[in-house]
């Protein structure tokens, strides 16, 4: 028995030594495509860093991030936990062949502040302002969640937001719920699919009194059939089939101007270079940027629409550009000047606060809605 115990210890030590040697022999990686983030590097040593604990903490992060076959171990861990009956993985629910992000209870003070900021923006604006809150899959597909799984009541919040702000609303919850049986959200990502964005665009056009779009007007293109989104990365669940990204709107008909680098430059409706990387959703408009303008030369009535938005609008804006001369998109995470002043300067008379519920609850940049002075 003692010999068997010693043998087990020796084998385990050899295994650890082998892993350490493997780790030392492998070059460090700068980035994880699977997790879509920068990986920790070997920390700088100094006696001061050792004394204050930052070097030790840095070493822990370094070994955790640079561990050999990290992605395989992460996936194996998630698979083992699933076999033990676990259904929530790092804030993500496994619902059959679909991953759905849990929406936690918000910071109530921040939530109320955001609603107040939007209300003041609506009161100060010289144009029309609408509120469009996009429910996540956890609300529209709540029947798919594990039994008893907690998730924030987004429907109640959307109704409360309409009452608190006093703004006319876009019924995105109703539009998406009506089509809940269709693939309106990605299975491995938190965004809506292009089909979901199409239904969202029609809900917005309906609220604005514009002619609705017809699905038959578009010919979807399968831009990618191997999209593994943010929930794939966050959860460690790597065994589901990848998603398909579709482009519906022709990129030949619209002119795109971007301020991605901080200055005006030609943009793209679809930046296909992203399709070669993990973050394929950023192929819509080229991803995050402070300001982007879509122009449709075929619409000659001078109509302009402003979207104060998050990344959900990247796949929605091309649809709206079918009914407006110009669609302006402002992302307050990067655009830190007055939106009210921008509206006045550009002669825009209609704006929509178009946010996913999760992002709206946590946003700390709505202060930039107000006019200067």
List each model region and its residues:
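Extracellular glycan-modifying ectodomains
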Residues: 1-373
